[in-house]
Swiss-Prot record:
Gene: Rbm48
SUPFAM superfamilies to which the protein is assigned, alphabetical: RNA-binding domain, RBD
Molecular function in Gene Ontology: RNA binding
GO cellular component: nucleoplasm; spliceosomal complex
Biological-process GO terms, alphabetical: mRNA processing; RNA splicing
Disordered as annotated region, ranges: 220-249, 343-371
Function: As a component of the minor spliceosome, involved in the splicing of U12-type introns in pre-mRNAs.
Protein name: RNA-binding protein 48
UniProt xrefs under CDD domains: RRM_RBM48
């Protein structure tokens, strides 16, 4: 940047305060009248030049005022810099560039000890390493911001819909290893190619009820498969299938063995897992009460059989390891502490074993108020 008189101590062009813009629209004017000036990363700097400071020895107060906007690395007075009479010029270097931006915005044209401050950037005081670091930080910031914008743009893209039901079924079977991959052609030319024929697509049973671990045999139950598929197309059979789906999985397994052509079919999944089953409020309360009673009976059974030699369900908790302290007195003290801890833990009061009805009746009922 060229200077006005060509000397290093002269006033640079970017140090001169620009006049207020008078052609700005009314709706764009802020609270304070400002000039039109564009700052690039090359013009911004951690160094701030403060002009118009009254020469009353208020450097400490000035630094404290600027320290409100960020950490200051160094500061000094510029005696050789040309200034007005009875004023001084100071140079302050901030640790972060963002702190210098905020300080310049807040402290420019502010009153300080009767004088009007003029704050501007001073990039000519930067070293080559500081300028390189500033440019690298700016590049990293730009790449991070553009990457986030690209991420949000790609996130808002609509997902393409599936064209056909057959394609979706093929994708479903391809991603689910537990299902047999059915053949599209029900009458293959080479039976050796399709070594594991399972349910054809013409069968209208829900696919979520069938799962297999081992491949199905090729020549088994071919006649039964066609009969079951033809019978499953009728709505009456589907309605009967829905009615039987409420039974336990063991009964479902017996009914599917006669209709499914695969020899190795696991137990069918209950319909209540796939479709939500309506249950009245009273039934839900009764079911909860029954489960609480079962849990209570199981707990009392385990408590009564602790002394016996029966195997308990669940892993055994590890005991407190005994540590040898290599001293008789210390070992005696440690044993006393362990025994005391066992007494404290065993003396915890147990909850009452009575039924919930007895507990409810133990509390006195509130008398009904008569009007």
């Amino acid at each position: 940047m060229a200077s006005s008189d060509g000397k290093p101590g002269g006033i640079f062009d970017h140090h001169v305060q620009t006049a207020v813009c008078d052609s700005r629209a009314k709706y764009r004017e802020g609270r304070r009248p400002r000039a039109v000036k564009v700052y690039t990363i090359n013009l911004e700097s951690q160094y701030l030049l403060i002009q118009g400071v009254p020469a009353v020895g208020a450097m400490k107060e000035l630094v404290e005022r600027f320290a409100l906007y960020g950490a200051i690395e160094q500061y000094n007075a510029l005696d050789e810099y040309p200034a007005e009479d009875f004023t001084e010029v100071y140079l302050i270097k901030f640790v972060k560039l963002q702190s210098a931006r905020i300080a310049k915005k807040k402290m420019d044209e502010q009153s300080f000890f009767g004088g009007l401050l003029h704050v501007c950037y001073a990039p000519e005081f930067e070293t080559v390493e500081e300028t390189r670091k500033k440019l690298e930080e700016r590049k990293a910031y730009i790449s991070r911001v553009t990457k986030n914008q690209d991420y949000y743009v790609t996130k808002k893209k609509p997902v393409p819909e599936q064209k056909g039901t057959k394609d979706s079924r093929q994708d479903f079977h391809a991603h689910m290893p537990g299902f047999c991959t059915p053949a599209l052609n029900t009458s293959p030319k080479n039976p050796s190619e399709n070594s594991s024929p399972c349910l054809p697509y013409s069968c209208e049973f829900p696919l979520c009820y069938f799962a297999s671990k081992s491949p199905c045999s090729p020549g088994e139950h071919t006649d039964k498969a066609s009969d079951s598929c033809n019978s499953a197309r009728n709505r009456g059979e589907l309605q009967k299938h829905r009615d039987h789906s409420a039974f336990p999985p063991k009964l479902q397994m017996n009914t599917y063995k006669t209709s499914v052509p695969c020899s190795s079919v696991q137990e069918a999944i209950a319909t209540s897992q796939a479709v939500g089953r309506f249950m009245p409020r009273t039934t839900q309360l009764q079911e909860r009460k029954r489960r609480r009673d079962c849990d209570r009976e199981l707990g009392t059974f385990l408590e009564t059989n602790i002394s016996s030699n029966e195997v308990l369900i669940g892993p055994k908790l590890p005991g407190i390891p005994t540590v040898d302290l290599q001293d008789d007195s210390l070992n005696t003290t440690a044993n006393l502490i362990r025994s005391k801890l066992k007494e404290v833990t065993s003396s915890v009061p147990k909850p009452p074993e009575d039924n919930g009805e007895d507990v409810c009746t133990s509390h006195p009922r509130k008398q009904r108020r008569r009007i």
